[in-house]
UniProtKB/Swiss-Prot annotation:
It is found in: Secreted. InterPro entries: Snake_3FTx, Snake_toxin-like_sf, Snake_toxin_con_site, Toxin_cobra-type. GO terms for cellular component: extracellular region. Gene3D superfamilies: CD59. Heterodimer of C9S3 chain 1 (AC P01408) and chain 2, linked by at least two disulfide bonds. Expressed by the venom gland. This is Synergistic-type venom protein C9S3, chain 2. Disulfide bonds join C3-C24, C17-C42, C46-C57.
Amino acid sequence: LTCVTGKSIGGISTEECAAGQKICNKKWTKMGPKLYDVSRGCTATCPKADEYGCVKCCNTDRN
């Protein structure tokens, strides 16, 4: 499985997931008005969102 770890004007960066990590995730955390910290990567289970963010998980390549 290959997950996107970052997106920018220059393109996307990806990582190959380790054994046992079969889910790609993207997590948004609100840092301020219209300002979010976004993290992406591989995981074994879909993390839960906290009160200031949201999480999207999938098990397909490069989403």
